[in-house]
Amino acid sequence: SRAGTSGHWFVGDGMVHGLVLGNGAAQSYRNRWVRTEPYVAGLGFGKGAPGGGNSQSNVSVFWHGGKLLSSGEVGFPYELNIADLSTVGAWDYAGALTGSFTAHPKTDPATGRMHAFGYGFTAPFLEYYIIEPDGTMSHRETIATPRSTMIHDFQITETDAIFWDLPVVFDLDLAIQYINDP
């Protein structure tokens, strides 16, 4: 995390690392900051990359639908150039994604479909997505939940997606109060 920002790793900036292997040895290494909107704004480069949410894109990197993507727990995933790890920009699945996107999508090995979800601080608290092997979102469903909880991960079976109802509950009013008066 840059100087003057939180030291908590949940809110740190994302950095990706790439290692090329060949002939039994490392051939090259590189790393790049994921140039999310908050990262670019923090560097004073003016308006950040297009996209929604406040994504640090700091948790996972995955390949699906012909794209290398980086994701955090909130906001959109970010597309990365596989050749040099530069940031292409926020990826919203051709406008189908309007809320947050998990850092832990699951790809069904039998179908190649990627299953994902997004959770938020305001209703709807949970949305479930299915993305086809070509990268198009084919299914988006709101799942009714009584409150906003941190749904860090989930599981899939051949027929179901399983979401955990965990005890970490978000209180938006308390968060706003803390922001205004830490």
Predicted regions and their residues:
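N-terminal regions that are enriched for targeting/export leaders
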Residues: 1-51
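Short, conserved, GDST-rich strand-edge loop motifs in beta-rich repeat architectures
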Residues: 1-8, 166-182
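Generic beta-strand structural signal
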Residues: 11, 21, 63, 107-109, ...
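Structural motif
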Residues: 13-15, 76-80, 123-129, 169-178
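Well-ordered mid-protein domain cores that form the structural environment of catalytic cofactors
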Residues: 34-139
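Short coil/turn segments at the loop-to-beta-strand junctions that recur within blades
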Residues: 94-98, 144-149
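Conserved beta-propeller blade repeats
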Residues: 103-106, 149-153
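Short, structured patches in soluble enzyme cores that scaffold and shape functional sites
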Residues: 118-121, 130-132, 141-145, 155-160, ...
